[in-house]
Structures are given as structure tokens and as C-alpha cells.
Amino acid sequence: MKDKIPTDYDRYLFHQGSHYKSYEFLGAHPCEENGKTGVRFSVWAPNAAEVRVIGSFNNWDGNINPMERINDSGIWTTFIPEAKKGDLYKYEILTKYGDTRIKSDPYAFYAERKPKTASIVYSLNNYKWNDKKWMDKKKDYTVYNKPVLIYEVHLGSWKRKENGDYLTYRELANELVEYVKDMGYNYIELLPVAEHPFDGSWGYQLTNYYSVTSRYGTPEDFMYFIDKCHQNGIGVILDWVPGHFCKDDHGLRLFDGTALYEPQDPRKAENEWDTLNFDFNQPEVWSFLISNAVFWFDIYHIDGLRVDAVSNLLYLNHGKGDGEWVPNKYGGHENLEAIDFIKTLNKVIFEYFPNPLMIAEESSAWPLVTYPAHLGGLGFNYKWNMGWMNDTLEYMEMDSIYRKYHHNLLTFSFMYMFSENFVLPLSHDEVVHGKKSLLDKMPGDYWQKFANLRTLYGYMMGHPGKKLLFMGGEFGQFIEWNYKQGLDWLLLDYDMHKKLQNYVRELNYFYRQEKTLWEGDHEDGGFEWIDPHDSEQSIITFMRKNKDGSDYTIIVCNFTPEVRHNYRIGVPEFKEYKEVFNSDLEKFGGSGQKNSTIIQPSEQPWHNRPYSIEITIPPLATIFFKPLNQ
């Protein structure tokens, strides 16, 4: 427990924007100084006239523990021997304008449960991890040519107790982890878990970037959750919001009486969410945010970050009209400082940690998002494919009668599928705000809704890119996601929902064992069209190949409720073929149409290929075929 007084070097790096572990000296740190145990408090408030620590240890009396300014650094610090782990505290900041602001600690490791807002003194080095095998494996493990199945979760509404209370991190470590493992997913992506005051923000409007939310337990409890994930072969990705923060009075807004974390000009500070943008002209903001990203990897052993609202970082005019934004120094709308920040962030994370996932939620056509900075890119290694998601859902929501007129919605994503490293997301954003659940989006009668959804999931598994599905989609949640309650697990008492869940489970396991579906996710050789042109019957046929091209799987998707008998497709080899997966099986809720016998090849050329086979295509179905090695 060495002292935590900020050193000259710490302060220098912090003010340069290049201290990437600033949480080690800012905030509240239990330690020993001059033979006394206590807590060292340090905070950056350069424009304050005076800063004091108030808390449960001094009866919230600001006169007892004033802080000392370290030279002209803007950092205030003090050691309080009466303070200890678990104590509540805030900073009482006297501004140069004569008013007083009561603030929670930007670097606090824990916070009171809402609606209370005090920070809590906490030490994060007491948990004994049991994930060494997982952490060692990451050193040599890259996901690019591996299967990635992400289950996206909001911890507060996956499941609730009978009395409506949240499940705790430790309860989730048992129930959720066991469920995710059984379903065949190998990653959990959590909606933001840092402390936030408003449940309705789903965690995206933060006040405390270093405090895991106390809604579900303590920091050790969350470490236990991640530890349990790793012990069960499941990686953890956190949703992270570095672009903007909550306006609540106890948070970062006007922290020392001046615009410190946010730009002073409201045209730069305001955004469409009624939060405040970070000021990326401030190097200390870089230190704060990059340190925060490092913090989650370093302290909590996470495996990746999904970076929210990257478009808002890239563009000064994102979501704004004329006169509501300020051009950059060249007169353009690019946020030059934020772009540099993103590149530096990714560079640091890839230097500090082995094989992390850095995933951009970016909806514009910004180029080279998943290329390294030295090649002109932003430095992420994955990007959500919002174009695929929008086009696919627009297509799937149409009555099957009209799909033939919009066939391009189905095929266009294959034109740019290798332009970035993509994740195919069916996320929380698509099942809220009147958009309806995935199942309810599907057209047709009750049976057709399920058949359409099975077809969509099968098509998604065949399409190049890693996969993400929001909780509830796997069993056909019928109503939209509601953060105020758990999912409708009672639906599993109904046959079609149970069969859909079984389908998703078996599809996940089929995908994970079939190398052709993921080894070539990011290489031209990993995909080959057989027939993209059958718009009249709303059928597409394509091949996925393994890394060296020695093996392949043929995928056929039928987006109408018509059975197609004796449907001929071109094949590359004169071999027998076998149906290996079919979304229309009765056990999945389908009609039971299948190719039950070995399919014999024909020397009749078809689809510009030397050979062909005739198959039965079930109604509203995705089917997978493999050649038999002879």
C-alpha cells in the first residue's frame, strides 16, 4: 500500500494526454503514508478556487479536509487517515465565481446506488482471479479466422427475480453464463455497466466511468462474473461510451465551475441525446478516456470494447442542422481531434493487451474503420455492419410476394462484405421505439413469422462476418425489449418458441464446428456466388470456403413460402452432396421438407459451373449442403 501522491512524471503525462493509467494516482486510494493507513484523494480541477473532501468520515463538513493544489498542475490532493474502504465521499468545489459545486469523483471505483450519488472508497486489488488459462490463451488467439457468436445482454432486464429485483452479478455469473454456454455463444456483450443515474438511458448516459454500476453488486462481484465467463470459455465485451456524458449535476458537467470535460461552445458541446460531448482539444480528457479503456482491460480482464456512437465522434455536424455546429480549422465537418483520439486509443489498447476486440458502432460510410492507423485507418479491428442490418431487416419485413422486386436489398451487402472486418448485428437498437421485436417484424401468419426468422438466422450464419444477437431473439420474444422487466421466459412453455430456441442452439453449434462458415470471413476466397440472380423466386445460392479453399459449404436461402422441387444449382465438383443443416425440420417448427437422401451429381453445366445437382428447397428456409469426399 505505497503512497499514491501524484509524481511529477504522472502529472506531466496526464497533461500531455498520454497517461494511460491515470486511475492509479487520481481518485481515492487506500494506502499507507508516514506509517499511517488512510486514503489519498486526488482530483483534477484546475480552475477551482478551493477543493475539499467531504464524506462519512468527517460528517460531510468541508472545513475539516481541504485539499492542497500541487503547484500549477490543476491537481488537488490530500491524505485522510480517518478514511477507509467503504466510506462515502464527494468533492466540495469552490469555484472562482464564488459558488460551490458538490461532485462525485470522476475516477471513483464504486458509487452509491441511484438515486444517491456519493462515491465510495474502494480497493480493486483484493480479488483472486481464476482465469489464467483464458488469459494465457489470448496471447496467441486471434478471432479473424475463428467463430464469433456474440450474445448481447442488458443485465437489468435479461431476467428478474419474482419480486422484480435485479439478479446480482454473482447470480448472473451462474444463470446467464450457464445459459449462454448451453446456447453455444462464445462472447457476451454487455450494454454499458459503468454507473449511470437514469435506467431509461440503458447505461449510455454515464456519470462515473470507473465505477461498475452498484445496481447488481460490488466491483468484486463483477470480477467474479467475468471470471466465471472466462472459466466457461466465454469472452466479455463491454459497450463503452467515450463520446458524451450525462449532464447530471454531480457528474462531469462544469466540474470545477468551468467547462472542463466538455467544450465551452454549446455548438460543440450539445448533441442529439441531450448529453454533453467530450472536448477532445483537452489532453487531460484523452488521459481520462484512454485510461478508462485500459482500466477495463487491466483491472476487469475484459476481452473487448464495443465503442458506441463513433459517428458522433467523427463528425462535428452529426445530428445537427446549419448553424448548430462549428467547422474545423479547414472548414470541414470532420472532428480532427476526436479522430486522432480514436487512432491513439486503438493503438494503445493493441499495444497494451494481446488480441483485444475493438469494435466500432459506426453507421456512416467513413472509410478504413478497421484498418490500422499507419495505413490511414481508425485502428479498430471490427465494425458493426449497419448497412447489412438495415437492408436485411427492410427486406425481411416485406410480405414475401413483394420481395422479388427488392432482391438487391438481399444481395447488396455482398458487394462490400470484405471492405471492413464486419460484425453482423441484430442488436437492442432494432427491437425498441416501435420497431417491434424481430419475430413480430416478420410478415405472414404465426407459422410464417417463425419460419421467416429461422430463415433470417440461417442466412446470417452463412453471410461473411461475425454474428451478434440481442437477448430474447433466440427464443422469439414477441413484444419489444423493455428495460423495466425481464424477458418473457414463459414463452418457452409454447412449442414454437421452444423449437426456435432449439434451432438457434443447434445452428450455433453447427456454425462453430463448420470451419467454412468462418475461416474465410475476411478474405475474398472465403465466399463465392453460385446464383445471386433468382429474384423471381426470391432464392439466393452461394458457397463459403475454408481458409485454404479445400473445403466448402453450399448455402441456399428461400425467402418465399413456396416449396421448390427439382431446383437445379451449379456445383464445382462431380461429387455426391448431402444436406447437413435445414431450418425447416419439424423439430425446429418447420414443415419437414428436406433432402433426406444423398444427392447425385449431374454432368449438366449450370450457373457457369461444370456440374449441377437437383434439390428440394423447403418453404421459407435456409439449407446447407456439403460435398461427400469420395
UniProtKB/Swiss-Prot annotation:
SUPFAM superfamilies given in the database record? (Trans)glycosidases, Glycosyl hydrolase domain
One Gene Ontology biological process = glycogen biosynthetic process
Q: One Pfam family of this protein, by short name? A: Alpha-amylase
Q: Which GO terms describe its cellular component?
A: cytosol
GO: which molecular function terms?
A: 1,4-alpha-glucan branching enzyme activity; cation binding; hydrolase activity, hydrolyzing O-glycosyl compounds
Q: Recorded E.C. number(s)?
A: 2.4.1.18
Which controlled-vocabulary keywords does the entry list? Answer: Carbohydrate metabolism, Glycogen biosynthesis, Glycogen metabolism, Glycosyltransferase, Transferase
What domain of life does the UniProt record list for this protein's source? Bacteria
Family statement = Belongs to the glycosyl hydrolase 13 family. GlgB subfamily.
Summary of the function given for this chain in its UniProt record: Catalyzes the formation of the alpha-1,6-glucosidic linkages in glycogen by scission of a 1,4-alpha-linked oligosaccharide from growing alpha-1,4-glucan chains and the subsequent attachment of the oligosaccharide to the alpha-1,6 position.
Quote the subunit structure annotation. Answer: Monomer.
This protein is called what?
A: 1,4-alpha-glucan branching enzyme GlgB
What lineage is this protein's organism placed in? Bacteria, Bacillati, Bacillota, Clostridia, Halanaerobiales
